[in-house]
Amino acid sequence: MRLLSNSEFAARLVSHNTDTALASSELLVDGKPTGVVVDGAILEAAVDWQDCRIAFFTDDIPFEDMLRIYMFDANLALLDAAVLGGMYSTGAFTDLHLQPPNTLAFRFFAGTVWRAVLLAEREFALPFLSDPRGVSRTFKFFRHFRIEGEPLPESLPGASDSAETARRQPTASASHRASRKS
């Protein structure tokens, strides 16, 4: 498992976001076009794992950015894909950590450390039920990587940026009720 450099694996923007279509990018291997085009505007990172390449793309849409994770085989055939995000929410792809032998940890949205667990063999998965909230995939019964994470509720506009801190602090009325019962 290793992070790929931009000279080994990159992307070239083919079309920009429009009102009706997402941006798309062509994959480049060793600086050469492959003809493989995926949804996504910015290649955030790429990882090599057991003759597979895992690519992380964002859409570059302010206030509604999605993270697209693609897994390709050695011939760049798409094995699996997932999208993290939701309407009216945004994220920033940060803190990618390779955790051998088969896990990629990162942050994107909802104050969560997400994990992509790469699978040597495909596994059965129930569509719409097997992934955490905020993760979507095309309808199919098998996957080649699992997404794990427990997204926190989105904070309200003007509220503290730390949803975790807000979630753990009792409200004044709850504290008042507890002291009255004693």
What are these regions (language model features)?
Residues 1-20, 51-63, 70, 95-109, ...:
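Short beta-strand elements that form the blades of beta-propeller/WD-repeat-like
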Residues 1-47, 149-170, 182:
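Terminal domain-start segments
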Residues 2-8, 37-50, 87-97, 133-151:
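Repeated scaffold domains used in trafficking and secretory/extracellular systems
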Residues 19-37, 69-86, 113-137:
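Surface-exposed loop/turn elements that mediate protein-protein interactions on large endomembrane-trafficking
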Residues 37, 41-87:
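A contiguous binding-surface segment within folded domains or other stable secondary-structure elements
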Residues 75-105:
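An exposed acidic His-Trp-rich patch
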Residues 109-174:
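Mixed-charge, glycine-accented linear interaction segment located at domain edges/termini
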